[in-house]
Structures are given as structure tokens and as C-alpha cells.
């Protein structure tokens, strides 16, 4: 089972040079040591610019560290080929901040494209069965012929989750996926992620929100200025940031959380 290990990982960015003024290197992450074991549900929290997104991109192999090493299943993420598809595609399901569904394609066509990227060319009936299965998992049966514009933002997020799950990856990487969702959509997304995690999938979710992190009480890795400043097995969003006297975002989610929260808390 794949374990994720970061060993003193640093990543720096060079901003575009201004016509006047000094040239400053931006810190993505700095000297991060972190181990995440298979089956964990981990929130990566912190202010905007704290390094959450950079950390996920490094784990996914979409960026290379300037210093240190990233290992997933004791391999460095990259373009290692295995059984006709890349090792990275086998390991990760990814959802980034912006919606990335192709608007001119139906939901079924979007998922069929993802299936082909992962598995290669297959018989149409095999692809159709797989699509129906993942849409059923996210509670969206019968939307194959609809276009993204016909769905709500919350439903589009669930389609993206179905797309991320189509290759049955052992690890899900999620970056601010509940931003701009209403309370009910956030709640539905949390239930789905909780169910996926209970089946053994590792879930790593970067967020700048607080309410549902505090409800779920899973492992919380706190970042500030590119560094990991806290790592609590069953923590709350502000535990470490308050001690560090750093500001943090408070997002109020409707009271449905307070009514039903015990159903998904361990």
C-alpha cells in the first residue's frame, strides 16, 4: 500500500522581474518533512499563499522539488510507464481549484476521455459500464447526456470526483474543491469523500476553510509561509495557527452541519 514521504522538501519560484525594484524569490514550500500513510484522511490547512497547493503539486509529481525528495510507494512521482499508462495516473486522482470539465462535451464524453487516458482504447460497452459505476458512486445517475452548463457547481464537482475515481486510484489529491459551494453541496461532498476514504482511499485535501475541518476532526497538517508548523492526528483548523498568532479564515456553513455532524465524525 503506497505511503507518501517528503524528506526536507523545498520548492522556490522566480516571479516575473519588474522593471524597477529588487528581484525576490518566492517560497512554495520549505524544508517539509511529512509522511502520509495509506488510508489516512488529511486536511492541509493554512492561509492563502501558505504552500498548500504547492505541496499537493509536488506530491502529484506535477512539479519537482528544488531540494529534498518526494516518494510515493518508495518511487519518485513522474512518467514511469506501467501497463500502458503512467504510474502517476495509476496512483492519483486529482481535483484542482478551477473546474476543468470540457464544456462542449457531455458528462459521459468527459468521463470517457478520462477513462481512455487511464486505460487506453476499450470497447464502448466497457467504458459505459465504468462511467455508470462512478456516477452512481457520486450520486449522479443518468446525467451522461447532460452538459456541464446544465448542472450546478456542486454537481460539477461531483462529476470531477467521479472522473478522479475512474481509474480507482489509491490516493485522492483535492485542492480547495469546496470553494464557492453552498452549505448543502459542501455537506454532500464531505459525505462522498468520507465514504471513499472508508473504503481505503487516501484523501489529502487542501483548504482555507474551517468549519467542516473542525467537525470531521481528522488529521490536520497546518502550513504557514511554506513550512509545516503543525501536525495533529485529530485536530481543529485553528489549533496551531492560534498559538502561532497567525490569522485564519472562518467560513460559516449552514447549521445542517451542527444537526448531522455526528454521522460522519469518527
Indicate where each model-derived feature is located.
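Conserved ABC ATPase signature
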Residues: 147-151, 155
Amino acid at each position: 500500500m503506497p505511503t507518501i514521504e517528503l524528506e526536507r522538501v523545498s520548492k522556490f519560484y522566480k516571479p516575473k522581474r519588474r522593471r524597477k525594484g529588487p528581484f525576490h524569490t518566492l517560497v512554495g514550500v520549505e524544508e517539509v518533512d511529512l509522511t502520509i500513510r495509506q488510508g489516512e484522511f488529511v486536511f492541509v490547512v493554512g492561509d492563502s499563499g501558505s504552500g498548500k497547493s504547492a505541496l499537493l503539486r509536488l506530491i502529484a509529481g506535477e512539479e519537482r522539488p528544488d531540494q529534498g525528495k518526494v516518494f510515493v510507494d518508495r518511487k519518485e512521482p513522474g512518467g514511469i510507464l506501467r501497463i500502458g499508462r503512467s504510474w502517476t495516473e495509476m496512483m492519483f486522482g486529482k481535483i484542482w481549484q478551477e473546474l476543468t470539465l470540457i464544456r462542449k462535451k457531455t458528462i459521459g464524453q468527459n468521463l470517457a476521455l478520462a477513462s481512455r487516458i487511464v486505460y487506453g482504447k476499450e470497447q464502448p460497452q466497457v467504458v459505459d459500464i465504468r462511467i455508470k459505476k462512478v456516477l452512481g458512486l457520486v450520486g449522479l445517475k443518468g446525467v451522461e447526456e447532460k452538459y456541464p452548463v446544465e448542472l450546478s457547481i456542486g454537481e460539477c464537482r461531483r462529476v470531477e470526483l467521479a472522473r478522479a475515481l475512474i481509474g480507482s486510484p489509491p490516493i485522492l489529491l483535492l485542492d480547495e474543491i469546496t470553494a464557492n459551494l453552498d452549505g448543502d453541496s459542501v455537506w454532500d461532498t464531505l459525505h462522498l469523500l468520507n465514504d471513499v476514504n472508508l473504503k481505503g482511499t487516501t484523501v489529502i485535501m487542501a483548504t482555507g476553510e474551517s468549519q467542516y475541518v473542525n467537525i470531521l476532526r481528522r488529521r490536520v497538517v497546518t502550513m504557514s509561509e511554506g513550512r509545516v508548523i503543525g501536525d495533529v492526528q485529530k485536530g481543529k483548523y485553528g489549533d496551531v495557527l492560534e498559538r502561532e498568532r497567525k490569522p485564519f479564515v472562518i467560513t460559516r456553513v449552514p447549521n445542517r452541519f451542527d444537526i448531522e455532524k455526528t454521522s460522519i465524525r469518527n
